[in-house]
Structure formats: structure tokens, C-alpha cells
Amino acid sequence: MTNILSPEKSENDQELPIRPSYLQEFVGQQQIKENLSVFIKAAKSRNEHLDHTLFYGPPGLGKTTLAKIISNEIGGNFKSTSGPAILKVADLAAILTNLEKNDVLFIDEIHRLNTAVEEVLYPAMEDFELDIIIGEGSAARSVKITLPKFTLIGATTRLGLLSNPLRDRFGIPMRLNFYNTEELKKVLNRASKLLDIDLTDSGSEEIAKRSRGTPRIALRLLRRIRDFAAVEGKSRVDKEVSDFGLNRLEVDRIGLDSNDYRYLKFIADNYNGGPVGIETIAAALSEQRDALEETIEPYLIQIGLLQRTPRGRVITIAAFEHLKMSVPNQSHHQFNIFNENE
């Protein structure tokens, strides 16, 4: 699923010039920032490595950025990979044996590591040792390699898919939450200065309100609205220009786009609001289940338009109202929603 409101990283998201490098530059996630600052200062004062850290939550909220910030704050090198990229134990061994003291190893989508790789990672995280088998058959022998004290930072959008043994080995688990409008305005204002965009307060607020609580989306929308402003001969991005650009991009007043409407209308039209299983929805919309669960559903749940129940997905009365549709058997629909969540 690719669209302007996808929180997933795109090749067109050129974030390097505006990506913050240190905690004091990072906007939002205040409690996480404050706690990380304490943990980093404490580790440096003891001349120890920072405990392994796990960032989890919806995509586009700053997990990769925070990992790079930690690397900068502790003064180590930053090495980045992803769960799907580590196919074999040998792949992981090659990465680990090239680390130096205080390096940060960032593994994105860490929930997608295979079991064999995970088992090798356990002693590396706990004891900073790598146990590998050299040779085959009767000539095979185990070799133990001592690793430097490094910090592993894992990132996942699917905490429930992370195995318990791996999850328990992270000393610092942190959940990233959606941003509010004021926080997104600060993100946009900071970016507009770095990108030399004349962004007014009203223009910033209009973009922020329609960015699904996600900085990555807000920054992407800012770039596209800048394009509309340039072509329309507008030197300043105010509310009118922002509204014009967002309407052209088919982003409505609460941040929904055509994919969200397809999702909600399918449940409303075909199942009277639900419940309906996610596999049925995915098949009907010709989308992958993961794409729906990671890209569309989190925001719909966050703003109260969707509920997940044991029997399936149910859209709320607020969703019917936003779609300008009548609620079928309203009292019965409300009762079922609450009943399923008991």
C-alpha cells in the first residue's frame, strides 16, 4: 500500500537534512526523551554501555531517528540493519564481529528475525559472547568469540510478534505514541526553517491536524504543499494554501484519505458496521493484512472510528457520522461493540 498518508518509510522521504541529531533537538515523546537522557548520562558516568533498548509503536514516529540520536549521544558508531536482512547466523556473526565498544547496532523490524538467528543473539546481548559452529560433521567445533560492549536497539511496529525471550532481554523498552497537533506544529516549524519554507502558524496547524499524528506524514505533506505553493505562485504557505494542497491530495479534515474511506465503507455497506474478520477485509480490498494492520487501522482506532473485537472489526457510530451514513439499528450496534470488548 503506497499513498501520501502511509506512515511507512518511502524512498522519496528525504529526511537527512532535517533529522535531529541530539535529544534536545528531537520534538515530542517528552517522557521518552527525559528517561533516555537519564539512562545515557548514567551509563556514561559509569563508563558502561547503554542497556539494550527496544522502541515499539506505529511507524513514522521516530524510532530510527532516536536510535541514531542515542548513537550520537554516547559517541559510538551507528550500524543499521533489519530483521528480514539477517537471513543466516553467519549474517549476524559478520555484523557482531565488526562492532566496536559503545557501538549502536540498530535492527529495524526486529520481530522478523528467524529463530536460529535469535538464539545466537541471546548470548551476544546478555554475555557479549558469540557462540558459532565451525566445520561440519565430526570435524565441527564450537568457537566462543568475545564481543565488545555494544548497545542493541530494536524497533518494531508489532510488539506482539516479538518472542518473549528476546523481548525480555531489552533493559529499556519504550513505546512511542502518536503526536498531538501542537507537537506536530513544532516538527513542521522546525522543518520549514531548515527547508527555507515560509510557513505561517495557521498553515502549520492545518497540516498538523491532517497528518494522522505522525511526523513522517506531516513532513511529507509539507513538501508536497510546498510544490503546490510554488506552482500556484504563492510565496507563503498559509492555511488557504495548505487547505488547497491537502484537498488536492485528497486528505480530509481529520486526516483520512481514499484508502481509509474504502476500508470504512466496505464494513459499513457490506456488514452494517461489523464485526467482520480482517482476512475478509484484506481479500475484499485486495490489500495485505499487514498493510491494513500497520497503515490504516492504528489511526482509525486512535481517533475512535474503529474497534477491534474478538469477533472482528467494528466501525463506531462516529465513523458512520463521518461517512454521513445512517447508523443501522443504532442501539443494537452500540451494545454489540461494548459486549465484544468485555
UniProtKB/Swiss-Prot annotation:
DNA binds at residues 289, 308, 313. Residues 1-179 are annotated as: Large ATPase domain (RuvB-L). Its main location: cytoplasm. The keyword Transmembrane helix does not apply. Keywords: ATP-binding, Cytoplasm, DNA damage, DNA recombination, DNA repair, DNA-binding, Hydrolase, Nucleotide-binding. One of its GO terms (biological process) is DNA repair. Its EC number is 3.6.4.-. One of its GO terms (molecular function) is four-way junction helicase activity. It catalyses: ATP + H2O = ADP + phosphate + H(+). Residues 253-342 are annotated as: Head domain (RuvB-H). ATP binds at residues 18-19, 60, 63-65, 126-128, 169, 179, 216. It is found in: Cytoplasm. Pfam families: AAA_lid_4 (PF17864), RuvB_C (PF05491), RuvB_N (PF05496). One of its GO terms (cellular component) is Holliday junction resolvase complex. InterPro entries: AAA+_ATPase, AAA_lid_4, DNA_helicase_Holl-junc_RuvB, P-loop_NTPase, RuvB-like_N, RuvB_C, WH-like_DNA-bd_sf, WH_DNA-bd_sf. The keyword Chloroplast does not apply. Mg(2+) binds at residue 64. Residues 180-250 are annotated as: Small ATPAse domain (RuvB-S). The RuvA-RuvB-RuvC complex processes Holliday junction (HJ) DNA during genetic recombination and DNA repair, while the RuvA-RuvB complex plays an important role in the rescue of blocked DNA replication forks via replication fork reversal (RFR). RuvA specifically binds to HJ cruciform DNA, conferring on it an open structure. The RuvB hexamer acts as an ATP-dependent pump, pulling dsDNA into and through the RuvAB complex. RuvB forms 2 homohexamers on either side of HJ DNA bound by 1 or 2 RuvA tetramers; 4 subunits per hexamer contact DNA at a time. Belongs to the RuvB family. PANTHER family: HOLLIDAY JUNCTION BRANCH MIGRATION COMPLEX SUBUNIT RUVB, PTHR42848. Homohexamer. Forms an RuvA(8)-RuvB(12)-Holliday junction (HJ) complex. HJ DNA is sandwiched between 2 RuvA tetramers; dsDNA enters through RuvA and exits via RuvB. An RuvB hexamer assembles on each DNA strand where it exits the tetramer. Each RuvB hexamer is contacted by two RuvA subunits (via domain III) on 2 adjacent RuvB subunits; this complex drives branch migration. In the full resolvosome a probable DNA-RuvA(4)-RuvB(12)-RuvC(2) complex forms which resolves the HJ. Has 3 domains, the large (RuvB-L) and small ATPase (RuvB-S) domains and the C-terminal head (RuvB-H) domain. The head domain binds DNA, while the ATPase domains jointly bind ATP, ADP or are empty depending on the state of the subunit in the translocation cycle. During a single DNA translocation step the structure of each domain remains the same, but their relative positions change. This is Holliday junction branch migration complex subunit RuvB. It comes from Rickettsia rickettsii (strain Sheila Smith).
